[in-house]
Amino acid sequence: MACGLVASNLNLKPGECLKVRGEVAPDAKSFVLNLGKDSNNLCLHFNPRFNAHGDANTIVCNSKDNGAWGTEHREPAFPFQPGSTVEVCITFDQADLTIKLPDGHEFKFPNRLNMEAINYMAADGDFKIKCVAFE
């Protein structure tokens, strides 16, 4: 995967929403949105896989604590289509991150690192970001 957008000093607080809108490549295999303190401390590794790493049409979520990956969570909902424009909304609190998918489906992923602010975001893979908004 080519290196995509990286942003720091976001200071996203609990209850605030991070909206990411972009275009999925027509031949997409997977893409990644990482959120956390920095690249080694991620409260959310959000990885929709069209056909990658042995997964097909599956969202894989994980966390990374001081460079060590946690246990993967697989979400069966998969509203992504190659060649489409999508929007994902992410909010968090002390306990969980809530991910709202393009079709309105929501699921929770535990805030394993107990982050009180999200300062880092990175996007990579077969996804071209068009808009990032904070609400």
Curated annotation (Swiss-Prot):
The keyword Secreted applies. Signal peptide: none annotated. It comes from the Eukaryota. The modification Phosphoserine is found at S30. Gene3D superfamilies: 2.60.120.200. The modification N6-succinyllysine is found at K108. This is Galectin-1. Its main location: cytoplasm. SMART domains: Gal-bind_lectin, GLECT. Lectin that binds beta-galactoside and a wide array of complex carbohydrates. Plays a role in regulating apoptosis, cell proliferation and cell differentiation. Inhibits CD45 protein phosphatase activity and therefore the dephosphorylation of Lyn kinase. Strong inducer of T-cell apoptosis. The modification N-acetylalanine is found at A2. It is found in: Cytoplasm; Secreted, Extracellular space, Extracellular matrix; Secreted. One of its GO terms (molecular function) is laminin binding. A beta-D-galactoside binds at H45, F46, N47, P48, R49, H53, N62, W69, G70, T71, E72. Binds LGALS3BP. Interacts with CD2, CD3, CD4, CD6, CD7, CD43, ALCAM and CD45. Interacts with laminin. Interacts with SUSD2. Exists in a reversible and active monomer-homodimer equilibrium, the mononomer/dimer state is regulated by lectin concentration. Interacts with cargo receptor TMED10; the interaction mediates the translocation from the cytoplasm into the ERGIC (endoplasmic reticulum-Golgi intermediate compartment) and thereby secretion. It comes from Cricetulus griseus. InterPro entries: ConA-like_dom_sf, Galectin-like, Galectin_CRD. PROSITE patterns: GALECTIN. GO terms for cellular component: cytosol; extracellular space; galectin complex; plasma membrane. Residues 4-135 form the Galectin domain. The gene is LGALS1. GO terms for biological process: apoptotic process; cell-cell adhesion; myoblast differentiation; negative regulation of T-helper 17 cell lineage commitment; plasma cell differentiation; positive regulation of apoptotic process; positive regulation of inflammatory response; positive regulation of viral entry into host cell. Pfam families: Gal-bind_lectin (PF00337). The modification N6-acetyllysine is found at K13, K19, K29, K108, K128.
